[in-house]
């Protein structure tokens, strides 16, 4: 019983510490946005992948990095409208 409580408290701690881990009220849009932003940040952080994208798009590395940062603003498009209850 004590171990179960410990696991839940660890999960709650991770969810409060890191944005992308989600929580019980995370919507599908928020989850996908976090996944896309995490992927884009990984692409920017790995030098070889950034070089590959630059060669494939025939752009400079700085331009590719700028485009990736621009895509991080709204990676899945505008958020869906909230339904009012």
From Swiss-Prot:
Name the UniProt record assigns to this protein: Splicing factor 3B subunit 5
Keyword Phosphoprotein: no
UniProt record, GO biological process: mRNA splicing, via spliceosome; regulation of gene expression; spermatogenesis
Pfam families with a match to the protein in the record: SF3b10 (PF07189)
Superkingdom in the source lineage: Eukaryota
Consequence of gene disruption: Lethal at the first instar larval stage. RNAi-mediated knockdown in germ cells results in male sterility.
Gene Ontology, cellular component aspect: precatalytic spliceosome; SAGA complex; U2 snRNP
Function recorded in the entry: Involved in pre-mRNA splicing as component of spliceosome. As part of the spliceosome complex, plays a role in the regulation of spermatogonial differentiation. When associated with the SAGA transcription regulatory histone acetylation (HAT) complex, might be involved in the transcriptional activation of a subset of SAGA-regulated genes.
Subunit structure: Component of the SF3B complex. SF3B complex associates with the splicing factor SF3A complex and a 12S RNA unit to form the U2 small nuclear ribonucleoproteins complex (U2 snRNP). Identified in the SAGA transcription regulatory histone acetylation (HAT) complex; the interaction is RNA-independent.
Sequence similarity: Belongs to the SF3B5 family.
Family matches, as InterPro entries: SF3b5/RDS3-10, Splicing_factor_3B_subunit_5
Keyword Transport among record annotations: no
Cell compartment(s), UniProt: Nucleus
UniProt KW keywords: mRNA processing, mRNA splicing, Nucleus, Spliceosome
Major localization class: nucleus
